[in-house]
């Protein structure tokens, strides 16, 4: 289960992280300390569960939960806070549970089990309602994405249809996804992983957890800080290749 802990207090994050490591079933536990970092992670990664504090430095956890709820595939939310005054509002937002600080392992485990139960039930329903040829359907979906030459983008209550070949890069910053093309720029609230699926062919490569580029639109590559690269696109936009994506990037453009 992939989980994100959102709390502006490092000690609280560390304590909850430690307790979750005592419970089986967590393969990834990430952390965020503010709204901007949280939205960036949620738009670039898919999480099963978010532990969310109420009082964050820059915004209310309740307000953040309302934004999360509007996502196409929102993660489950467990509020983890020192205040009990927002419990009713939390459950109005379909929170799985509401746990109070100081944290106790037994209480955390009880809340986590509720999430596991919901995920299990959801998977069973998906299995029952799916066709027998699920694998072939997934293959067909991938093939459809590769065959589809255009991509619809919704912005300002209008839907723009753009050619995939014209897309130079897709990136996330401050919770906003930007699609750069050869002739203009679009902004949307769709998460980065949505475009990863839509642009799943050999032309588009991920160079950062928040950036996808079209390698056919690379103009130049230069050495950058900490043994990384900076990529300049034909549009003039510049993007940094993060160290974790360096090996794959070099292979994709023939430097390996």
From Swiss-Prot:
GO terms for molecular function: DNA binding; phosphorelay response regulator activity. Residues 151-255 form the HTH LytTR-type domain. CDD domains: REC_LytTR_AlgR-like. Disulfide bonds: none annotated. The modification 4-aspartylphosphate is found at residue 53. PROSITE patterns: HTH_LYTTR (PS50930), RESPONSE_REGULATORY (PS50110). Pfam families: LytTR, Response_reg. SMART domains: LytTR (SM00850), REC (SM00448). Signal peptide: none annotated. Member of the two-component regulatory system LytR/LytS that probably regulates genes involved in cell wall metabolism. PANTHER family: STAGE 0 SPORULATION PROTEIN A HOMOLOG, TRANSCRIPTIONAL REGULATOR-RELATED. This is Sensory transduction protein LytR. It comes from Staphylococcus haemolyticus (strain JCSC1435). The lineage of its organism: Bacteria, Bacillati, Bacillota, Bacilli, Bacillales. The gene is lytR.
């Amino acid at each position: 289960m992939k989980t994100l802990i959102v709390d502006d207090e490092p000690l609280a994050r560390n304590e909850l992280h430690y307790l979750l490591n005592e419970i089986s079933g967590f393969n990834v536990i990430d952390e965020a300390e503010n709204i901007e970092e949280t939205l960036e992670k949620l738009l670039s990664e898919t999480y099963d569960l978010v532990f969310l504090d109420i009082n964050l430095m820059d915004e209310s956890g309740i307000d953040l939960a309302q934004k999360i709820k509007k996502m196409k595939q929102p993660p489950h939310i467990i509020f983890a806070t020192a205040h009990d005054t927002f419990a009713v509002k939390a459950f109005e937002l379909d929170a799985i549970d509401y746990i109070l600080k100081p944290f106790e392992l037994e209480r955390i485990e009880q809340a986590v089990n509720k999430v596991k139960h919901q995920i299990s039930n959801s998977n069973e329903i998906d299995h029952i309602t799916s066709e027998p040829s699920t694998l072939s359907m997934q293959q067909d979906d991938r093939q459809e994405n590769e065959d589809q030459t255009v991509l619809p983008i919704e912005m300002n209550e209008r839907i723009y249809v753009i050619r995939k070949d014209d897309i130079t890069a897709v990136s996330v910053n401050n919770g906003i996804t930007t699609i750069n093309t050869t002739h203009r720029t679009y902004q949307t609230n769709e998460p980065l992983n949505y475009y990863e699926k839509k642009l799943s062919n050999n032309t588009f490569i991920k160079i950062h957890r928040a950036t996808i580029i079209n390698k056919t639109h690379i103009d130049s590559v230069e050495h950058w800080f900490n043994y990384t690269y900076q990529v300049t696109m034909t549009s003039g936009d510049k993007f940094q290749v993060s160290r974790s994506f360096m090996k794959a990037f070099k292979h994709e453009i023939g430097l390996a």
